[in-house]
């Protein structure tokens, strides 16, 4: 009885996507994308696309995907937003075109944001107005900076975000409204654990988005 071969994995960067997809196509011409478009699967091998890569269509043949890959650089945004902290970056291809990280005083002594406290416990006293004003100011600034970024560099191709579910409606409740709709097909929730937003965390998340990999067992 022979042992099963050890699975092997190689990693590649987004800049190598076209080369890696083409090579995978040549070796596994029958490979197709899964239902979520995140990877191409063949017997004994899988190519996981970088999260920042153009998404494959459900069941799309790898050859079709390879032929429609464009040489142009996409304009992509990463938005990280939590109570009292926001960081965003706008990239064209590998170039960081614009970025900003902001922190404001919106968290109560018990660690709960003022907006959440008002929803669950009612009005608080000292400092509540300041915290709530700061929170709304942060939401407005977030939308303003995204609008300015789109005005300068053109429509976003993909919008990656880590925004708590309870915060999402609040982002749409302030003026100006976001430059995207609630059900915008460009929106992609980050499938990553995100720490408190700042510039270093923004860059860490971006690096995660650029990594793809190929695994095979034969």
Give the residues covered by each predicted segment:
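Terminal alpha-helical anchor/extension segments at protein ends
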Residues: 1-218
